[in-house]
């Protein structure tokens, strides 16, 4: 896994409700995947929504992985049919995300690289989104937050006798689908270290920094923008134990 991809991609489907998934047998290094959700979030989705109807957010995806020797590659395409009763999404086109990635294990460590193109996605997903990328009109409570763009991330894991050193660096360029002057460029990097205390217990630490350069709406219903440059940093320390 690549540390930091959620911070620079435009769509992450990590957890979904009501999913049917299929994984094909691996043949000549290729493994195919497919999944579908008739209601991606039954607890926090739109009220009065009905599963497998246009009132809910529906999702589908296809993926393929190729693994042979030191090389592993993946490709996925994901589709989102947004709810037609949520004010923010009822007029939006279907969302799409195409992701390509891979890693290669060298003698010194493993190198990771991944990229994603996304279009008509509802909100940028990263938890450290300091300033929402949105357009607000006075006449409507709805916020236009449909975004498009692309992101890249590269990572490195270097194993040593004392543990693993981890590094990642990524960027994202995004804009509102209907208001291209409202946009954001992000650069994010992180370093980490994990040390196995035993076969079941691992201690880990990491530090990261994220910088945004954004053109945001200066006032509700205004077409004027103002440049803001928020940033965030964090340090974590933790321990995991497998039972």
Regions found by a protein language model. Give the residues of each.
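Detector for outer-membrane/organellar transmembrane beta-barrel domains
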Residues: 55, 61-190
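Short proline/glycine-enriched turn/loop segments at secondary-structure junctions
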Residues: 180-181, 225-228
């Amino acid at each position: 896994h690549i540390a930091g991809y959620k911070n620079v991609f435009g769509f992450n489907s990590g957890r979904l409700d009501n999913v049917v998934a299929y994984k094909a047998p691996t043949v000549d290094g290729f493994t195919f995947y497919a999944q579908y959700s008739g209601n991606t979030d039954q607890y926090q989705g739109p009220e009065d929504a009905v599963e497998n109807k246009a009132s809910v957010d529906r999702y589908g995806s296809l993926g393929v992985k190729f693994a042979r020797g030191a090389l592993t590659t993946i490709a996925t395409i994901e589709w989102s049919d947004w709810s037609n009763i949520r004010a923010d999404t009822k007029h939006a086109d279907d969302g799409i995300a195409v992701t390509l990635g891979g890693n290669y294990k060298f003698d010194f460590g493993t190198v990771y690289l991944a990229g994603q193109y996304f279009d008509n996605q509802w909100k940028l997903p990263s938890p450290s989104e300091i300033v929402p990328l949105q357009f607000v009109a006075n006449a409507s409570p709805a916020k236009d937050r449909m975004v498009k763009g692309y992101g890249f991330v590269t990572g490195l894991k270097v194993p040593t006798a004392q543990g693993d050193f981890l590094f990642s660096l990524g960027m994202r360029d995004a804009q509102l689908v209907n208001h291209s002057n409202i946009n954001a460029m992000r650069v994010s990097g992180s370093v980490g270290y994990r040390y196995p205390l035993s076969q079941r217990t691992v201690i880990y630490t990491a530090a990261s920094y994220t910088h945004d350069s954004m053109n945001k709406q200066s006032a509700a219903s205004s077409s004027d923008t103002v440049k803001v440059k928020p940033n965030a940093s964090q340090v974590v320390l933790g321990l995991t134990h497998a039972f």
